[in-house]
């Protein structure tokens, strides 16, 4: 007798000895019932029920055990295992398949987890009483279009914020009356919004931007009903939910700022009041005045240290080296002109990329050169110098000149060189460009007070031209020259 294949052998081994076709089984049940109804009726209910269900609708056969049995038969034929070991291998394989490779087990677990989540969510919604509101909101959103012509991201973000408002805020209700859907809240007074008309009003405003040069009547664009909806939804939006550059984004930003400044956190105040009462402070007026002082008064803080980025440090060192080289080439040139010459030599792309930092740095250099030339020269030559605290805010102080009696001499070592105590001839013309400002920084405390000194310094700074103003004036002159016709004298005269 030829050896059977493992698959055929498994099929023969898995057949039941008393298996009968479905027709015979159904006929047997019906004939038993017809011939002797009492015999079948006297059997237990579960036995009769299983027999009827199996006869009418047989259960689905599972070929897993046949496949496992075929594998075991193949192992036995290949002499990988002995015949007496086949039963143990078959049982172990069935257990492993049922534990790790059962799609039914995995799907049942997934369904169980999903059912638990839905039950928890339903319980939470029932406790808040907002299940009907969410159902009504979903019905309203189903009437809205899924896409809009402009501002799709703003449209989706606003709808998500509305859904979050209704799901998280208590004392909110969404209901339908006739063809309209309404949103009602009673948290701070009863307020009702017609959602249908509000979204009809907003349908043409998603993604619309306005220009400051073209003013428009904003009251004509939105109805009071729509503005109330924006006010209620505003706390649940931000600049990423609705673009802040759009018309609706500007309104939502204004509403958020207004609500943030106007409303107080009652929970925080009640907690502070409870703590104060626990410590023996029962005076509510004193507590309120203390809180108002803590909230309204701003303590004076010291300016923070300036931490430069690697790019800013590179720009600072480059400008220091450029000023030092320019001073070495022209040692008798004035400080403001040397700084302007350094700025004029900068590459336009380099200046535009670091314009803010360069402007602040050159302004500090201008002040240092005017008030203390020796300090200015020291920071230019110091390769480890960094701006002082308050550099960006302007809240800093420059070191004063130690010897105010020394005169500045432009004819010797330059405008910012170390002052020399030499007597200047009064008959020679004074070439010092800061001569008119010396009196403002003299030691004559009896004649001029500190207020006049600062006023003189402000006037001095106001009359000076920055490097940007000089560049703009130069561009205007070049444009004026280019607008004229250089060949006008060659044209024929009529």
UniProtKB/Swiss-Prot annotation:
Chain positions with Phosphothreonine modification: 268
Modified residue annotations for Phosphoserine:
439, 456
Name the UniProt record assigns to this protein: Pre-hexon-linking protein IIIa
User: Which source organism?
Assistant: Murine adenovirus A serotype 1 (MAdV-1)
What is the similarity comment for this entry? Belongs to the adenoviridae hexon-linking protein IIIa family.
- Keywords, sorted A to Z: Capsid decoration protein, Capsid protein, Host nucleus, Late protein, Phosphoprotein, Viral genome packaging, Viral release from host cell, Virion
Q: Can you state the subunit structure given in the record?
A: Interacts with hexon proteins; this interaction tethers the peripentonal hexons to hexons situated in the facet. Interacts with the penton protein (via N-terminus). Interacts with packaging protein 3; this interaction is required to promote correct genome packaging.
Give the induction note. Answer: Expressed in the late phase of the viral replicative cycle.
């Amino acid at each position: 007798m030829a050896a059977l294949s493992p698959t055929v052998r498994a099929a023969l081994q898995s057949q039941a000895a008393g298996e009968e076709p479905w027709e015979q089984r159904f006929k047997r049940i019906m004939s038993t019932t017809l011939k002797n109804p009492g015999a079948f009726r006297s059997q237990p209910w579960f036995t009769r029920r299983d027999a009827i269900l199996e006869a009418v609708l047989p259960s689905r056969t599972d070929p897993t055990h046949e496949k496992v049995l075929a594998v075991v038969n193949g192992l036995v034929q290949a002499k990988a295992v002995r015949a007496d070991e086949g039963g143990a291998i078959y049982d172990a394989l069935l257990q492993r398949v049922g534990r790790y490779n059962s799609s039914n087990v995995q799907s049942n677990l997934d369904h169980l987890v999903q059912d638990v989540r839905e039950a928890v969510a339903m319980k939470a919604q029932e406790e808040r009483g907002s299940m009907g509101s969410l159902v009504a909101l979903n019905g309203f959103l189903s009437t809205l279009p899924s896409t809009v012509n402009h501002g799709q991201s703003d449209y989706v973000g606003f709808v998500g914020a509305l859904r979050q408002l209704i799901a998280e805020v208590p004392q909110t209700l969404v209901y339908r009356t006739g063809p309209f859907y309404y949103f009602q809240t009673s948290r701070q007074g009863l307020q009702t919004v017609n959602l249908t008309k509000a979204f009809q009003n907003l349908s043409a405003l998603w993604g619309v931007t306005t220009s400051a040069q073209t003013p428009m009547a904003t009251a004509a664009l939105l109805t009071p009903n729509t503005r109330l909806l924006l006010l209620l939804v505003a706390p649940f939006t931000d600049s990423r939910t609705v673009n802040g550059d759009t018309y609706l984004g500007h309104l939502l930003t204004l509403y958020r700022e207004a609500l943030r400044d106007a409303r107080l956190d009652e929970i925080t105040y009640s907690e502070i009041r409870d703590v104060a009462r626990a410590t023996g402070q029962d005076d509510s007026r004193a507590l309120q005045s203390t809180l108002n002082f803590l909230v309204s008064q701003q303590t004076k803080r010291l300016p923070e240290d300036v931490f430069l980025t690697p790019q800013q440090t590179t720009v600072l060192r480059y400008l220091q080296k450029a000023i030092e080289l320019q001073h070495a080439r022209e040692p008798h040139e004035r400080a403001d002109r040397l700084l302007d010459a350094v700025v004029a030599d900068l590459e336009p792309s380099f200046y535009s990329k670091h314009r803010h930092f360069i402007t602040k740095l050159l302004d500090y250099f201008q002040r240092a050169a005017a008030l203390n030339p020796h300090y200015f020269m020291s920071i230019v030559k110091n390769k480890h110098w960094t701006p002082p605290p308050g550099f960006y805010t302007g809240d800093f102080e420059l070191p004063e000149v130690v010897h105010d009696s020394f005169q500045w001499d432009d004819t010797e070592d330059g405008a910012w060189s170390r002052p020399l105590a030499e007597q200047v001839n009064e008959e020679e013309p004074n070439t010092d460009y800061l001569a008119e400002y010396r009196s403002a920084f003299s030691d004559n405390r009896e004649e001029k007070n500190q207020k006049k000194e600062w006023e003189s310094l402000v006037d001095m700074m106001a009359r000076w031209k920055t490097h940007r103003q000089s560049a703009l004036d130069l561009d205007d002159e070049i444009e004026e020259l280019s607008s004229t016709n250089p060949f006008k004298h060659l044209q024929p005269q009529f």
